């Protein structure tokens, strides 16, 4: 079948298997082109391994450090003429490329929040790897069913204390719009912390540790985004910010636990990039379009793979690591360059429907969005027929 992009709001409802595979190969080539990661990990678990930063971490570990990788994700398989999700095709391509180099790769498809998937993961580690020396936590989900209570919590993107009016782009109509977000209720804040805070990360590390599958000296990191002044009302000062503060509290206990055996736990702060999650946030398409414009002009623009490869080389396995006052690893330094943020702020209120393409890189934003789903990838023939029914080798379901 021939597959073309069909976008509805902040979701592309089609995915291109060959495009996803080509995107994975591009990322692998970038990491391989930078040479081996010195003193890198050898047996890695990535929770949330199929797209974005989690996929980039799996690629960096495997093709930068030669690591065996076990990935956990929740993706939809293709069914007859209906394509699977992009994360499914990304993971299939990763497995193929790893196998070509003789690298171990296995994946588990299911709800990472559940006890069942944690146990399946532990069983796979015991059977195939013995122990892991790095655990990457990169889960982005709108809801979480708590494994102990059975309650399903929802995350909410809202300010706290007062309503906030945000500028943004109506991406369907390519027009500037303002959105009024009402403040979160206490229950909404608690739900957001339950989904996006540190509890599930702690549950993973506790379960892995109790099962004896964490190696001495093992490290763990959870990915987060903090941003600067433009995004603070909705991130750090909003309901999501409360979840991020919970992550900061959680990491202290994890660090103490792992340090007793020579290990470490860190929150890693990464730059803003186009993801399915960020595209749904009212202000982010405008912020990203301006950020791309400014950073590309300065030659400092980076995507997921550049960010995570740099994090591995410069901080996780480099010395001295780039650490802030709270002990977080910072890979977002170029985004937060005061000159970059000043330019973004200066342009923020000047953008109109008429100058959207002139003042911002909205065209680049749209391209990056489609690339998430396997479209707009160089060298892919989108007029050719492709088979959507691709399986993932060594998949545990």
Swiss-Prot record:
The record marks 75 as: Plays an important role in discriminating NADH against NADPH. It catalyses: a 2,3-saturated acyl-[ACP] + NAD(+) = a (2E)-enoyl-[ACP] + NADH + H(+). The active site is at 235 (proton donor). Keywords: Fatty acid biosynthesis, Fatty acid metabolism, Lipid biosynthesis, Lipid metabolism, NAD, Oxidoreductase. One of its GO terms (molecular function) is enoyl-[acyl-carrier-protein] reductase (NADH) activity. InterPro entries: Eno_Rdtase_FAD-bd_dom, Enoyl-CoA_Rdtase_cat_dom, FabV-like_NADH_b, Trans-2-enoyl-CoA_reductase. One of its GO terms (biological process) is fatty acid biosynthetic process. Its EC number is 1.3.1.9. Pathway: Lipid metabolism; fatty acid biosynthesis. Substrate binds at residue 225. NAD(+) binds at residues 48-53, 74-75, 111-112, 139-140, 244, 273-275. Gene3D superfamilies: NAD(P)-binding Rossmann-like Domain. It is an enzyme of class 1 (oxidoreductase). Monomer. Involved in the final reduction of the elongation cycle of fatty acid synthesis (FAS II). Catalyzes the reduction of a carbon-carbon double bond in an enoyl moiety that is covalently linked to an acyl carrier protein (ACP). Belongs to the TER reductase family. HAMAP family: FabV_reductase. This is Enoyl-[acyl-carrier-protein] reductase [NADH]. The lineage of its organism: Bacteria, Pseudomonadati, Pseudomonadota, Betaproteobacteria, Burkholderiales. The gene is fabV.
